Amino acid sequence: MQEHIADMFGIEERLKEKGISVDSMVTSAMLLYVPHGLSAEEATHKIREKIIRYLRDPNVASLLLGAILLEDELYLRQKDSGIQEDPVFLISDEIIGMAIAECIGGTYARFEFTRYDQKKPGILATLGPFLDDAVAGLIAGCTSRLYSECC
């Protein structure tokens, strides 16, 4: 039942429509990977598995859907909304990213989210204010969980 709910959101397909593939997220994750007893090849494989798994989690999927819809509305449709440059007063995007990270990796993932949010490796540098933080949260949650499982 849980997978069916997440699948009805079509998150992986919606992200692909925005130019965000699983491969691009894995590549971005590996740009800030901190070796933890796994080879880069092993870590890449495990991060890919985690990203795919958590794209199907209904809580993560619904937060990602929220970020997609907010970005479509405020960044693309309402071009005079003032959020194109990710203004300081806009914090809901970070809240979504942190929530995704914590859903997956717990409190430690919040710190991992900060690394990805600040450095914006790979695909993150090309995304708007909501999707960069939502995808950073997904990556951070998955890498944080990987680090806690392998150490």
Map each language-model feature to its residues.
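Intrinsic-disorder-associated interaction segments
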Residues: 4, 18, 40, 44, ...
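N-terminal interaction modules that seed assembly of large macromolecular complexes
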Residues: 4-68
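A near-ubiquitous, low-amplitude feature marking generic local secondary-structure context
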Residues: 8-12, 82-83, 87, 121, ...
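A generic structural micro-environment signature
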Residues: 21, 26-28, 61, 70-71, ...
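Short, hydrophobic/amphipathic alpha-helical patches that form generic packing surfaces
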Residues: 27-31, 65, 96-106, 137-144
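Long, charge-patterned amphipathic interaction tracts in eukaryotic proteins
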Residues: 44-116
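Glycine-rich, aromatic-bearing surface loops/beta-hairpins
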Residues: 104, 108-151
